[in-house]
Amino acid sequence: QGASWVITEYCGKHYMEQMRLHNTEPHRTFPTLETGDRFWKDYDIEASVRMFNTKWGNAGIGFCAQNSLNMLVFMFEDKQVKLVYRHKENVEELESKAFDYNSDDTYILNVSVNGSHVECYVNGTKYIDIDTVYAVQGGKAAITATIPAAFGYINVNVDEKTDERIKAKREEYSNKCTEAQSRYPKM
């Protein structure tokens, strides 16, 4: 089937493009590019996306991701914006709103996560405001699409206090790993 993701250039600007046309054989897949780690929490994520197909499939941003098969996703699908929880091949729709998107325009998706509270925006307008236990765990940020789509950028931001908290959790985990590994010096 070829590569899922490629870097393209148009008028001097680079894009990350998901190129696969069908992602259902031999099983359902969700092409995803991720950044960050499991310690990321309470952040804002923003990305630009232009879809090249609007008849089927989806494109959006993932967050609170443990991996590509366990994350929250704010996406365009079926002429709606949706917040869904993906776990393996199962997709649980948490909330959706009608949205008449097209393949001519580029859309700015933004999600703000604070504890269990999630707010989702398109082009600066809030469409979803929800509390969900799936957000509490935190995790990586991602772009994801099951249709050909171009992502121009992705930004993830936290405030200084949250950044310090994330770094402390990461260091605590690293110290625990180092301690556990020290008991097995020959490994």
Model-derived segments and spans:
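Extracellular glycan-recognition surfaces and repeat-rich motifs
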Residues: 1-29, 177-184
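Secretory/extracellular carbohydrate-interaction modules
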Residues: 20-91
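Beta-strand-rich interaction surfaces with strong enrichment in secreted/lumenal proteins
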Residues: 30-38, 61, 95-101, 130-131, ...
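Short tryptophan-centered beta-strand motifs in secreted/extracellular beta-sheet-rich domains
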Residues: 45-47, 104-122
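Short, aromatic/His-centered strand-loop micro-motif at the edge of beta-sheets
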Residues: 87-108
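Flexible glycan-contacting loops in extracellular carbohydrate-active proteins
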Residues: 130-155
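Activation corresponds to long, low-complexity, non-globular regions
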Residues: 163-187
